[in-house]
Amino acid sequence: MPPQNSSDWLHGFQTGADWFLACGNGLEQATASLCDPHAQSPSTVLLVGTREGEAARQALLPGHSHSRSRGVAQLQADGSTLDDEHPLLVASLDMDNVCTKQKPPPKHNARSRYKVAWLSESSPTAEAGSFVENVVGKLLLPFVDVVCLFLDDFSTREAGIRFLQRCGRHSRLSLGWRPQVILASSSTYRHKGSLGLPMFGSIQRVVLPADGRKTLSFSRFRALKNTILTSVKTVRKRRSASKTLYSAYHLNAFFESALRHVATCASSPFSFILATRECNQIQDRLWLCLRDFLRLCAANHTSQEAALEYMASALMLDSLPPGMHRKYATRAIMFPF
């Protein structure tokens, strides 16, 4: 029997004074649905809202079942992109749902769960809203390419911007890893001064047509989908150039590592580079191997440029997660020092 709510990506809940994070089945199920998850590099858009956010999710995922989430976030793959080199994953955050007190998920709906040590110890009376902002900023933002904020789903449009600002303050993402933002609303939104979103990339605005009985859901959100596709393509090019465009298989494994890290450590952000080393530790004898290699190069009169290019290639390939070597050809990462 398939698990219920298999699209739940992340669960967060409080038991007594303790907070917990649990990994849902959403990302694993989406990865399994792809034709070759080791070779496909998906892009992820995070929809943040309530009514409009849910309507957009249904328009972007036609044919999917849309059961109400029991977790902090849901995630599903766009069925029309399952065979694509870069599938689209659609994640959603229902603000009406995540900020209410949640119960622990059924065992079949969560793969692993971790106590949020730093939150339980430092602020045992933390509110659900503060918990969600921490989790979105520290855990979800590093795994999404685009954040789509539905301003009309908040009490005021400024409240929606403030929510994203608070999430951004917790993220500490590097310049090349910041997701782009799409502000969706029923009318043109003009904010006085800066939006105050330094932890995000470029910001675009989309005006949604009025929701009428004769308006098809897909047609209403067509402009939004086109903007999403353009934005994820821009982010994908940037990450491909920096050799940080990971496969679906590796993103699934990375998320488990990130979940564990965020739950246990508040002082440092999750690092994809360090995560690749968890099961692939650098040997203590590395410097001895390099010394011996350079001696052989000197004995065989190998040019300095050739020796350094070879060493750079070996070190770069070794730093990639297992299985990603075929994604980036050796010559593509060889460079002179």
Task: State the predicted function of each range.
Residues 1-337:
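Conserved GTPase G-domain substructure that encodes guanine base recognition and part of the catalytic core
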